[in-house]
Regions:
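Flexible, acidic glycine-rich loops studded with aromatic residues
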Residues: 283, 302-422, 426-432
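Gly/Pro-rich active-site loop or hairpin
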Residues: 55-74, 193-199, 233-244, 266-353
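Active-site acidic/histidine proton-transfer and metal-coordination neighborhood
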Residues: 30-33, 74, 78-81, 90, ...
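N-terminal basic, low-complexity leaders that serve as flexible interaction/assembly modules and, when applicable
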Residues: 1-65, 424
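Glycine-/proline-rich flexible loop or hinge segments
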Residues: 59-69, 93-106
Length: 432
């Protein structure tokens, strides 16, 4: 079998003093952080579409990265060699990442199964697992007006067949999750759009997908990935709050959770921390696409995460909900257009993995010391008993509350201590 990364050493942990660019400075998979090994906390995954299909092409220029793999099988072989050498335990893929469209739908399905069986062999040889699979319902021209929300039921049926087969392949490969991202599920103009009907159709599609997943014995999480725009002007999975409302409106909240991406949060006008915290607060945080955007740009740049201070807050949320499993941290990120060498793929992932590993260590210490949770607990302490407890228990009404307010008089102002808390977090960031 051809090897593609023979010139790259296996990536090992060497510690923060190492100057080796092909070594982890903070990610030590076997190190214990609390009750779990670091690898179990982080559950890193490589995104096949960026890492093995990306060429650096953009709207202004053709691809710059020339990769040595050509056939679908070669792409799979290169991927698993990369996973193993990097030390990533998981991967994610779209059906079209490994298996191109055929002349007919039947041929497309046959090609997908053939390549997935090849991937299964590589999984068994390497021990690398599938974090999640998904269907590409946005690239082909048939999906220019959506898949589940397309005005043509023939397109809806085609999308259903594609998802049906990809659910089967994800199940065959032992995938722990399945993701739905509606890149074309939305509109460019309301002049030709029936909003209610399209969202009804999307809900019906998701119910059918969940039914079929259970029918074939798939017990993994079903996840929806929010994104407000790009490629569509307005997407129905705009942000975490929108998706939660959609799930609850259509009776899907007990069947789906969310896969939250950092860059998508920024495009929706939110911080990564906000979107993760909101999903977790509703018990719907299932997995994370780990990347970052550029605050000066208005599109999905999908850069590798390098900002430890941003990630610390996210890791606190994950620790507070006792982990992401069966979800994980998938690097939905790509090297820059001018980063054309194979070794750049390793540098990018090493940086992302070290960023999350260091953030995990810092977040764990903050949680252990209780410096934030203790303040929050005290800040809301008035709701632990008395009138506050009755409010939370819905055991009071406006008449009683008015009497209480008249008796108590003007409430005393209490500082939110934002600056102090920011200094505390900085102390943990700086003291290593």
């Amino acid at each position: 079998m051809t090897t593609y990364f023979a010139h790259i050493p296996t990536i090992q942990f060497e510690g923060p003093d190492s100057k080796n660019p092909f070594a982890f400075k903070h990610y030590d998979p076997s190190a214990r952080i609390g009750e779990r090994a670091m690898a179990d906390h982080l559950r890193f995954s490589v995104a096949s579409w960026h890492t093995f299909c990306g060429t650096g092409a953009d709207p202004f220029g053709v691809g710059t990265a020339v990769r040595p793999w050509r056939t679908p099988e070669e792409r799979v072989d290169a991927a698993f060699e990369f996973f193993k050498k990097l030390g990533a335990g998981y991967y994610c893929f779209h059906d079209r990442d490994f298996a191109p469209e055929g002349a007919t739908l039947a041929e497309t399905h046959r090609t997908l199964e053939k390549v997935c069986r090849h991937a299964l062999n590589r999984q068994q040889e390497t021990g690398v697992k599938l974090l999640w699979g998904t269907a590409n319902l946005f690239t082909h021209p048939r999906y220019m007006c959506g898949a589940a929300t397309n005005p043509d039921p023939r397109v809806f049926a085609h999308a259903a067949s594609q998802v049906k087969r990809m659910l089967e392949m994800t199940h065959m490969l032992g995938g722990e999750n399945y993701v739905f991202w509606g890149g074309r599920e939305g509109y460019d103009t309301l002049l030709n759009t029936d909003l209610k009907r399209e969202q009804d159709h999307l809900a019906a599609f998701l119910h059918m997908a969940a039914d079929y997943a259970r029918e074939i014995g798939f017990r993994g999480q079903l996840l929806i990935e929010p994104k407000p725009k790009e490629p569509t002007k307005h997407q129905y999975d705009f942000d975490v709050a929108t998706v939660i409302a959609f799930l609850k409106t259509y009776g899907l909240a007990d069947r789906f959770k969310l896969n939250v991406e950092a860059n998508h949060a920024n495009l929706a006008g939110h911080s990564f921390h906000h979107e993760v915290a909101l999903a977790s607060a509703h018990g719907l945080l299932g997995s994370i696409d780990a990347n970052r955007g550029d605050q000066l740009l208005g599109w999905d740049t999908d850069q590798f995460p390098t900002d430890v201070s941003e990630v610390v807050g996210v890791m606190l949320v994950i620790l507070n909900q006792r982990g992401l499993a069966p979800g994980g941290l998938n690097f939905d990120a790509k090297v820059r257009r001018a980063s054309t060498d194979l070794e750049d793929l390793f540098h990018a992932h090493i940086g992302g993995m070290d960023t999350f590993a260091l953030a995990l260590k810092i977040a764990h210490q903050i949680k252990q010391d209780g410096v934030l949770s203790g303040f929050i607990r005290e800040r809301y302490g008035g709701y632990d008993d008395g009138i506050g407890r009755r409010i939370e228990d819905r055991n009071t009404d406006f008449k009683e509350l008015e009497k209480y307010a008249l008796d108590e008089g003007e409430p005393e102002l209490r500082s939110g201590r934002q600056e102090k808390l920011e200094n505390i977090v900085n102390h943990y960031l700086w003291r290593r």
